[in-house]
Amino acid sequence: VQVGTHFAVTRESDAHINFKRVLAEAGPEDIVTFMSAEGLPARAVLTPWLKRYLGREEGLRARATPDKAHCGRQVECLTFCGLKDGNGSAGQFCIETQLAAAQRGDVNLGLFFRGSESLPFGREIRSVHELLTYLLSGIRPTTPEPA
């Protein structure tokens, strides 16, 4: 069971408020599956950047070859990276750049990974205490705790 998104959208999370809102407000129709830069299937919220990328993905992957490989940031953040290695079976984007944008709360440029399951409190941003109460007991608090 993966519950990272549940904790990322709590009040106590140090994530940018836009980061929390993008994850909390995404409905099932907003979440897409695509090929990550690591070559693994990934789910994320369909943001403006991801929509643009997916429109170009097929062509980018078709043109990817080791002789055209490049890492513009030179950060070597991944051992295997479709962009850095020129591997067309993987995504052709800089994951470090897109995740950094998401961390800053940049909804237009960020990549916001998110599971497909609904969140325990829907679109509400609740406390860690409420989340743990729900996860451990199955009891969903009806009214939010005071901030």
Each language-model region and where it sits:
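Conserved active-site-proximal phosphate/metal-binding subdomains
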Residues: 1-147
